[in-house]
């Protein structure tokens, strides 16, 4: 691998730690994002070396599918698999109760399906993703079907949020999810009850899913730099 900066060294270390927890003869949920990408790379390395056998993945996004094929991880689907032994995924924010905000990559709907079905949901983050309260540094993503965009934005504003349509980078127009929907990013001054807000938003007609993951994560692996060296801790 090429020389990495401190942030990527943390991501690489925590990705390897997650990959080391994968066992042979298992079905693995493959998450989305820059930290999870390292985990997929290391899983692929272990398969090539023969350290792992009979491991298949269920991707949470087109990005995860592309990376899995690149690194030689066989794939399956929820139509075929009868279980998910472990899911490895990143997060944009993690609070002390292991609640998450996800969706920076606009893949949170598929991620929530796979992560919630997993026997063990393992979250991989660098230390910059840890917050005291959700919403402190990251907007809350909400996936919405296109025809409901304006009504949902009005409803989110009534809930105290400041909604804005996520626009594409290096493309004209809004971000379009793998499901063909739009993403609204919402700023809340304080998310005091994540579980209640998650349910309230998901009950709005036209909302497919939002980026609050409450009570889903089992293990958080955190990459840190201590004395100039990347380390990983668990909580």
Curated annotation (Swiss-Prot):
Binding annotation for substrate: 32-35, 89-92, 102-105, 129
Metabolic or biological pathway: Carbohydrate degradation; pentose phosphate pathway; D-ribose 5-phosphate from D-ribulose 5-phosphate (non-oxidative stage): step 1/1
Signal peptide: none
Keywords: Isomerase
Catalytic residue positions: 111
SUPFAM superfamilies, sorted: D-ribose-5-phosphate isomerase (RpiA), lid domain (SSF75445), NagB/RpiA/CoA transferase-like (SSF100950)
EC top class named in words: isomerase
Chain ranges passing through the membrane: none
Pfam families (UniProt xref): Rib_5-P_isom_A (PF06026)
Catalytic activity entry: aldehydo-D-ribose 5-phosphate = D-ribulose 5-phosphate
Family affiliation: Belongs to the ribose 5-phosphate isomerase family.
Subunit structure: Homodimer.
NCBIfam families to which the protein is assigned, alphabetical: PRK00702.1, rpiA
Name of the protein: Ribose-5-phosphate isomerase A
Organism field: Synechocystis sp. (strain ATCC 27184 / PCC 6803 / Kazusa)
């Amino acid at each position: 691998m090429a020389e990495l900066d401190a942030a990527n060294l943390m991501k690489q270390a925590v990705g390897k730690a997650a990959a080391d927890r994968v066992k042979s003869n298992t079905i693995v949920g493959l998450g989305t994002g820059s930290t999870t990408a390292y985990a997929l790379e290391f899983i692929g390395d272990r398969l090539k070396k023969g350290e792992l056998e009979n491991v298949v993945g269920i991707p949470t996004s087109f990005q995860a599918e592309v990376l899995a094929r690149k690194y030689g991880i066989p794939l399956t689907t929820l139509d075929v698999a009868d279980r998910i032994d472990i899911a490895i995924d990143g997060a944009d924010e993690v609070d002390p109760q292991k609640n998450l905000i996800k969706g920076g990559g606009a893949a949170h709907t598929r991620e929530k399906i796979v992560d919630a079905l997993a026997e063990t949901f393992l979250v991989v983050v660098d230390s910059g993703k840890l917050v005291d309260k959700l919403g402190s540094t990251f907007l809350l993503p909400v996936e919405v079907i296109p025809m409901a965009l304006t009504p949902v934005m009005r409803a989110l504003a009534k809930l105290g949020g400041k909604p804005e349509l996520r626009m594409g980078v290096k493309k004209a127009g809004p971000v379009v999810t793998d499901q063909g929907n739009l993403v609204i990013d919402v700023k809340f001054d304080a998310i005091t009850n994540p579980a209640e807000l998650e349910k309230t938003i998901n009950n709005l007609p036209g909302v497919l899913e939002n980026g609050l993951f409450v009570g889903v994560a089992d293990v958080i692996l955190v990459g840190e730099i201590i004395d100039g060296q990347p380390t990983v801790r668990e909580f």
